[in-house]
């Protein structure tokens, strides 16, 4: 079974939940370490999504400029 791709918004919400749980200081050190690890993984995924989106936007902008120059 193929794993469903998580949306940017869902990953960001999970990261915010992790940060909130760590900020309130009511979780154990072990749980904090697990949460930190999961948070870092989410940060990396979110960063990749943003970089991919940035690349697509640059391509679209370049195409728009070329279309404008050729008209």
Curated annotation (Swiss-Prot):
UniProt-listed Pfam families: Exonuc_VII_S
GO cellular component: cytosol; exodeoxyribonuclease VII complex
Lineage top rank: taxon: Bacteria
GO biological process: DNA catabolic process
Presence of keyword DNA-binding: no
Family as reported in the entry's similarity comment: Belongs to the XseB family.
Name listed for the protein in its UniProt record: Exodeoxyribonuclease 7 small subunit
Organism whose genome encodes this protein: Clostridium botulinum (strain Hall / ATCC 3502 / NCTC 13319 / Type A)
């Amino acid at each position: 079974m193929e794993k469903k791709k998580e949306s940017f918004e869902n990953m960001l919400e999970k990261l915010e939940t992790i940060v909130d749980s760590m900020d309130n200081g009511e979780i154990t050190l072990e749980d904090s370490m697990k949460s930190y690890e999961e948070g870092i993984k989410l940060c990396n995924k979110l960063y990749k999504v943003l970089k991919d989106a940035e690349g697509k936007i640059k391509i679209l902008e370049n195409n728009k400029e070329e279309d404008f120059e050729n008209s």
